[in-house]
Design a protein with these regions (language model features):
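N-terminal lobe/hinge region of extracytoplasmic solute-binding protein
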Residues: 41-92, 210
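Ligand-site clamp/hinge motif
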Residues: 234-278
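Surface-exposed binding/hinge segments that line
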Residues: 134-193
Length: 545
């Protein structure tokens, strides 16, 4: 029996913005005699809490606790009204959404949250001056795309405040996942007067933020290793928030988390590799599949080795994903041979999963890889050296060392140099396109297939690897506009786009679909694991006897 003395939560995650469901609770009755305080460890510092700029899922997990929007996800990842007081009114053609806000929706300073706060936040997101990496999220909103490229003013965005408590959105095409999309903190409101009063200091630390979610953050500034979450006393559903304090700190070493869990100093920590098998029968073990793609990304900048298609194809065919997941990781991850992970989207007309529909690409083929490698050597020379950018945590170490060994063994003359960096630096290097090979992952904000294909659209802020193909772009646009209401045609568009991306362009090498594995103190109940957006959610969590 473990002695639960210091109660701590540890988050360890791979990549950018997995599973679903929640622990069974014992009702909403607060346990008597237990101090409702926990601590949280994260593998990297929080990058930015400006919701227009947040991209990594680790930071976003905390942001989701601080900023609530019109809707939020329930324990089954179903969108339900948040700051909206009731379900949205949707026009028959699916193009107009009208939301009525809660009269008691307030900012953490007590000011009323208004429809104008949503207008401001959404306009700010698509404003080219903001340079928001997530601006594409509103591409379904009228005039958003034209505003993003500077062809129209932000005031033309299809959003309207009808008084203080009614917010209306005009779409250019129906979007089945729209309510899920607006449940993510990227589209939470911002208080214009407050933001502008802070100037460049907005979101630089906890003193220069306002909060609309169940918690506020204290004692945080960019780059700091520690911070504290406390209940937002102005939150409309304050009585449902049981935890009184969540202390956060940065811990990178998985071994450390497991050791502290076993001594009772942590009450939730993530597992991977051999630890999963070791603890699989432990009553505290919890596992669920992530809807995510972990991949090897190529920077195809002209004039660099990886601009060579033969080199990219040789690398793609020379990685044994079965061995990677079974031996190097051994944590429940599954090989992935496509851009889209399993269970992201299922065709409601025939229950066919897109991954099964689209088929497999870049499957391990050692001999074919060697043949293409010989062609690459004719183009580039016998000896080629490539740096591999990875995060400096346990997962990054395991994956990169496996890939290094596999490629150097299967492709004689290729040298892979691992360059580990803190995850925040990795993300910045990718944004700056300052890499050649990198390990990354993508976990979309909702179940829209387009959330993955946006990664490689020519003008996408996430297109770090300089992939560009006009046919791919046309198919991606057709799928989310012309064929948005016909899933069968949409599937066909996306399948053709995926083939161009992987079979023809070799833009990335899909590696695996990850699993999240935890040891959890059974005294924590009500903890939720959303399918989209964040790793977990503590709004309804509490400690029980």
């Amino acid at each position: 029996m473990k002695k639960w003395q210091l109660l701590t939560v540890s988050i360890l995650g791979l990549g950018l913005l997995g599973g679903c469901g929640s622990q069974k609770t014992r009702g909403n009755q607060e346990s008597q005699g237990l101090e409702q305080k926990i601590a949280v460890s994260v593998p990297t510092e929080l990058v930015t809490l400006d919701t227009t700029q947040t991209t990594d899922k680790n930071t976003f997990t905390i942001a989701q606790h601080l900023f609530e929007g019109l809707y939020r996800l329930d324990e089954n990842s179903v969108p339900i009204p948040g700051l909206a007081k009731e379900a949205a009114e949707i026009s028959q053609d699916g193009l107009t959404y009208t939301f009525k806000l809660r009269a008691d929706a307030k900012w953490s300073n007590g000011d009323k949250i208004t429809a104008g706060d949503f207008v401001y936040a959404w306009q700010k997101l698509v404003d080219p001056k903001t340079a928001a990496p997530n601006a594409y999220l509103l591409d379904s909103v009228k005039n958003s795309q034209e505003i993003r490229v500077g062809d129209k003013p932000v005031t033309d965005l299809g959003v309207t405040a009808i008084g203080e408590e009614e917010f209306q959105v005009q779409l250019i095409y129906p979007k089945q996942s729209f309510l899920t999309l607006i449940s993510i903190a990227w589209l939470a409101p911002q208080n214009q007067a407050f933001v502008e009063a802070q100037g460049e200091n907005y979101a630089s630390d906890s003193d220069h933020l306002l909060f609309s979610g169940p918690f506020v953050i204290n004692d945080w500034e960019q780059g700091s290793d520690t911070w504290t979450l406390k209940p937002n006393d102005a939150y409309y559903d304050r009585q449902e928030v049981k935890l009184t304090e969540i202390s956060g700190t940065t811990i990178k070493e998985e071994n450390t988390g497991i050791d502290l869990f076993n001594t009772g100093e942590l009450d939730l920590t993530k597992l991977s590799g051999t630890f999963v098998a070791e603890y699989a029968d432990d009553p505290s073990f919890v596992s669920h599949a992530d809807i995510a793609n972990t991949f090897l990304d190529f920077n195809k900048k002209p004039g660099t080795p990886l601009a060579n298609e033969n080199l990219r194809r040789a690398i793609a065919l020379s990685i044994d994903k079965e061995s990677l997941t079974k031996h190097a990781l051994n944590d429940g991850a599954k090989p992935l041979n496509g851009l889209i992970p399993e269970k992201l989207f299922i065709n409601p007309t025939n229950q066919e999963d897109f991954r099964a529909y689209s088929g497999d690409y870049l499957v391990y083929n050692k001999e074919a890889g060697k043949a293409v490698w010989a062609l690459a050597q004719k183009d580039l020379g016998e000896e080629i050296e490539l740096p591999l950018l990875v995060s400096d945590d346990d997962s990054g170490k395991k994956i990169s060392e496996y890939i290094q060994n596999q490629l150097q063994e299967n492709l004689p003359g290729l040298k892979i140099t691992i360059t580990p960096q803190p995850r925040t630096n990795v993300n910045q290097s990718r944004r700056d396109k300052d890499y050649q090979l990198s390990i990354s992952s993508w976990m979309a904000g909702d179940n829209d297939l387009g959330m993955y294909f946006i990664l490689y659209e020519t003008d996408s802020a996430y297109n770090y690897g300089s992939f560009s193909n006009s046919s791919y772009d046309k198919l991606a646009v057709s799928a989310k506009t012309t064929n948005a209401n016909d899933v069968t045609k949409q599937f066909a568009d996306y399948q053709a786009a995926e083939k161009i991306l992987l079979e023809e362009g070799i833009a990335q090498v899909p590696l695996f679909q990850s699993a999240s594995n935890y040891l959890i103190n059974p005294k924590i109940t009500g903890m939720e694991y959303p399918s989209y957006g964040n790793y977990f959610y503590l709004r309804n969590a509490q400690l029980t006897d």
